[in-house]
Amino acid sequence: MTRMLLMGPPGSGKGTQATRIADKLGIVPISTGDIFRHNVKSMTPLGVEAKRYIDNGDFVPDEVTNRMVADRIAQADAEHGFLLDGYPRTKGQVEALDAMLAEAGQSLSAVVELEVPDEELVERLLKRAEIEGRADDTQEVIEHRLDLYHRETESVIQEYVERGIVARVDGTGQIDDVTERLLQAVYSVRSATGSLPVIQPGAES
């Protein structure tokens, strides 16, 4: 049973790769962005609570985010494994995820981080902003987002490095090439830990 995290900065192509890798591994991709949108749109109690913070321009507390994630990974389609995209982002969220999994007698199989140079990320995000008409996404704003990502996730990545379940993957180049590298990384971690099903590089689902 595969339970993994896919991490990467804004503009790294993480969302696209999460769907592709989850499909290859036969597990469900779970994006925290999608979880938030679903809860807010459906006006669930957690969604109403989160929207109150968002409307006030405040960060949604870890407690609310953790409960949303716990509810999502407890659903039937995640029973046979999942790929989490966008969570955890803080040490507190790492501890919360550990507790969720421990309660179910589970643990994380792998953490894969997509690495792309900041210069390329800025270029990608500026191009996306131009195409989508996001006038507020200036270079200064984008660089701030990237700096925030690096500061937020450094301790999270280090925590998982110490557990021996992290693989870092070059996120530059063609989408198919990045997917292949990710599959190779997952296979490598599986070989080292014995915690993932055998997914040979280049294998089709």
Swiss-Prot record:
The UniProt record gives the binding positions of ATP as 11-16, 128, 173
Q: Which Pfam families match?
A: ADK (PF00406)
Cross-referenced CDD domains: ADK
Chain sites annotated for binding AMP: 32, 37, 58-60, 86-89, 93, 134, 145
Q: Among its keywords, does the record have Transferase?
A: yes
Q: Where in the cell is it found?
A: Cytoplasm
| Region ranges (LID) | 127-137
Keywords of the record: ATP-binding, Cytoplasm, Kinase, Nucleotide biosynthesis, Nucleotide-binding, Transferase
Q: PROSITE patterns recorded for this chain? A: ADENYLATE_KINASE (PS00113)
InterPro entries with a match to the protein in the record = Adenyl_kin_sub, Adenylat/UMP-CMP_kin, Adenylat_kinase_CS, P-loop_NTPase
Q: What is its EC number?
A: 2.7.4.3
Q: Which GO terms describe its molecular function?
A: adenylate kinase activity; ATP binding
Pathway listed: Purine metabolism; AMP biosynthesis via salvage pathway; AMP from ADP: step 1/1
EC category? transferase
Q: Where is this region: NMP?
A: 31-60
Q: Which reaction does it catalyse?
A: AMP + ATP = 2 ADP
NCBIfam families from the xrefs? adk, PRK00279.1-3, PRK14527.1, PRK14528.1, PRK14531.1, PRK14532.1
The family note in this entry says:
Belongs to the adenylate kinase family.
Quote the subunit structure annotation: Monomer.
Q: What is known of its domains?
A: Consists of three domains, a large central CORE domain and two small peripheral domains, NMPbind and LID, which undergo movements during catalysis. The LID domain closes over the site of phosphoryl transfer upon ATP binding. Assembling and dissambling the active center during each catalytic cycle provides an effective means to prevent ATP hydrolysis.
Please describe what this protein does: Catalyzes the reversible transfer of the terminal phosphate group between ATP and AMP. Plays an important role in cellular energy homeostasis and in adenine nucleotide metabolism.
Protein name as it appears in the record: Adenylate kinase
Which gene codes for it? adk
